[in-house]
A protein has these predicted regions:
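Conserved alpha-helical scaffold segments that buttress catalytic/binding sites
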Residues: 2-135
Length: 135
C-alpha cells in the first residue's frame, strides 16, 4: 500500500487576503485577493454568502492547499472552507481537528456561520473524527 508520507511535498502557503493584515510570509506564497468579500464575510455571514465564497474559492484555491492564512481574527470561520475541501478527499472519521482559540467556537447560529459557530459545522463533516480545542 502506498504511504502518502513518502511523496509529501510541503505546499507554498496560501493567503486569503480579506483585509491586508497578513504580511508576506514565505517565498512562493499564493495570495488570493478577497477584499471585495470583506464586508459580506467579516465576523459572520448568511449561509448564502458563505456558499458563494466557498464556490469562488473552489475555483482559485490550489488543489494541494496546505497552510492557509486568513487575515485578522475576523475571518477565522472561513477555515471551514479549506477543511471541507480536505474532508472530501479523506475517508470517514480519519481527521482530528485541532483549534487553538480561547473560545470553543461551537455555538449554533441558525442564520448562517460566524466566528463563534464554525467549529460546530466542522464537527459535522464525515471525515472529522474529533475536534480538540486548546486555549
Amino acid at each position: 500500500m502506498h504511504d502518502p508520507r513518502e511523496s509529501f511535498r510541503p505546499s507554498p502557503p496560501v493567503i486569503l487576503d480579506f483585509d491586508g493584515s497578513v504580511l508576506p510570509v514565505a517565498e512562493g506564497e499564493r495570495r488570493i485577493p478577497l477584499g471585495s468579500w470583506q464586508e459580506a464575510i467579516r465576523f459572520g455571514c448568511t449561509r448564502r454568502a458563505f456558499s458563494a465564497l466557498e464556490a469562488h474559492l473552489e475555483g482559485v484555491l490550489p488543489v494541494d492547499c496546505g497552510c492557509a492564512f486568513m487575515g485578522s481574527g475576523d475571518f477565522h470561520h472561513v477555515t471551514l472552507i479549506p477543511l471541507r475541501r480536505l474532508c472530501r478527499r479523506l475517508p470517514p472519521a480519519s481527521l482530528d481537528v485541532v483549534v487553538f482559540d480561547n473560545h470553543p467556537d461551537n455555538m449554533r447560529y441558525p442564520f448562517g456561520i460566524h466566528c463563534g459557530s464554525w467549529v460546530s459545522h466542522a464537527a459535522l463533516q464525515p471525515s472529522v473524527r474529533r475536534v480538540h480545542v486548546i486555549g
